[in-house]
C-alpha cells in the first residue's frame, strides 16, 4: 500500500510519484474511464468561478488555472511537474487546509478524496475554514460512508488508519454543518 510510505521525505517522494499514475489507473477502472474530478469542477470553470482545491495532493483534482494547497511538498512537486505541461497558470502552495487564508474569498472551495485520510478534528477545522473562505460553496468528495459494508482489507487499513473512523462518523460531522 503506497499510503504506508507517508507524505514526506524519501517515502513521500516515492508515494507522490506513484500516486499520480496509480490514481489515474484506479480512477479509470472505478469510474469506467470518466474523469470524475473534472466532472465535478468543470461546471464551475464554465461559469468563470475561482476555485481553491484543499488537500490537492498531486493536483489531479485541481482545475487548470486555479489554486491547490497541500501540506506535502513532495506531492506538490509532482503536481507542479504535471501541470506545468498542461497549464502554467495553475498555482500550488505548501499550506495547511485547516489554517490557510487567502487574501480574498474564493468562489468555490473543494476537498477531494482527502477526508478519509485524516482524524475527525481535522474534518471539522477544514470545514470551518473552507466555509469562511468560500463565497458560494464548499464541495467535499470522498469515499461513500456505505463503503464500510465492503470490509476494507487489512493492507488498506494499514495505509489508511483513519478510514474506519471516517466511515463511521462522517455523516454526523457533515450533518452538524448542513445548511438550515
Predicted regions mapped to residue ranges:
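Hydrophobic adenine-recognition pocket in adenosine-nucleotide-binding enzymes
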Residues: 114
Amino acid at each position: 500500500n503506497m499510503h504506508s510510505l507517508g507524505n514526506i521525505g524519501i517515502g513521500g517522494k516515492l508515494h507522490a510519484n506513484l500516486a499520480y499514475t496509480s490514481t489515474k489507473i484506479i480512477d479509470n477502472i472505478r469510474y469506467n474511464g470518466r474523469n470524475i474530478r473534472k466532472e465535478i469542477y468543470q461546471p464551475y470553470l464554465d461559469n468563470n468561478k475561482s476555485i481553491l482545491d484543499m488537500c490537492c495532493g498531486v493536483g489531479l483534482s485541481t482545475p487548470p488555472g486555479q489554486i491547490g494547497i497541500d501540506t506535502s511538498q513532495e506531492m506538490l512537486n509532482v503536481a507542479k511537474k504535471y501541470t506545468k505541461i498542461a497549464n502554467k497558470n495553475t498555482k500550488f502552495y505548501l499550506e495547511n487546509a485547516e489554517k490557510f487564508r487567502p487574501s480574498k474569498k474564493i468562489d468555490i472551495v473543494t476537498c477531494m478524496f482527502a477526508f478519509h485520510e485524516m482524524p475527525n478534528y481535522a474534518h471539522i477545522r477544514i470545514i470551518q475554514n473552507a466555509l469562511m473562505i468560500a463565497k458560494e460553496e464548499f464541495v467535499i468528495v470522498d469515499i461513500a460512508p456505505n463503503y464500510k459494508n465492503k470490509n476494507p482489507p487489512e493492507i488498506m487499513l494499514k495505509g489508511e488508519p483513519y478510514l474506519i473512523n471516517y466511515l463511521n462518523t462522517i455523516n454526523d460531522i457533515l450533518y452538524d454543518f448542513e445548511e438550515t
